[in-house]
Amino acid sequence: MQTLRQIPSLMGKPQTHVAGEPIVALHNISARYNGRFALQDVSFDLIAGEQVAVVGPNGAGKSTLFKVIAGVLPNSGGTVSVAGSGPGTHICIAYVPQRSQVDWTFPVDVADVVMMGRIGRLGLFRRPKRADWEYVHQSLDVVGMSAFAARQIGELSGGQQQRVFIARALAQEAELMLMDEPLTGLDVRSQDDIFAVLDELRARGVTVMIATHDLNLAAERFDRVMLLNGQLLGFGQPEDVFTPERLVNAYGGHIRMLDTGDGTMIVNDTCCDQ
């Protein structure tokens, strides 16, 4: 499997955004979903090149946040800036949806799914050129899916499908990747495959936001964590964000923090109260 650093066509292009500078800036964002406020008064800056885990209970607004940043869903208040411009104006943003939102029965092969990432650069009615197909196959190689290029997307495992969608984002030449619960339903080996790809994205300087329900994984694997429940409850280092008070505010009384020999483990307590 090639690495991003071994692919000149993916690495030779200079960065559009400067590492260490904000690539995303939200100020007092509010957004509605299904007629109610899903986000209220959310503000933060995201530094180019970092990897951030967004956590919170179901209905916390994680997916809504990603859609607002990507320009898919309009905000009802506040301002969104992506690389200095409004949302929806950049093809450098890739949104990887939840697997449950994708129709995996649609008859399309893996290579064509990845080619969809080139549409923003091609335009809707232009045929892909040889260079575009090179991007497709190189992107599949990066995520270890070259051997599946002709396979129907619905025939793949959950982890393989997620890697194909990451390859689509690579073919798009995305510099900001928004991944909505890509680890949900995956076994440990498939999760490790995803994290290997994330390491390659880090080497390239791609900024990544991932929504996840696994607080321990968020604390162990990411530069910063964001705790969300309609409002921004905390954003920073895990030890500063995952405090008992904030976790209760986010999850109610169903979170327990256990001291272990290796640190603190956060447990979701779903048992009935005695």
Description of each model-found segment:
Residues 243-245, 249-274:
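ABC ATPase nucleotide-binding domains
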Residues 177-181:
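Catalytic Walker B motif of ABC-type/P-loop ATPase nucleotide-binding domains
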Residues 70:
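Helix-to-loop junction immediately C-terminal to a conserved catalytic motif
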Residues 75-93:
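Conserved ABC transporter NBD signature motif
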Residues 115, 130-148:
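Conserved ABC ATPase "signature" region
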Residues 152-156, 160:
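Conserved ABC ATPase signature
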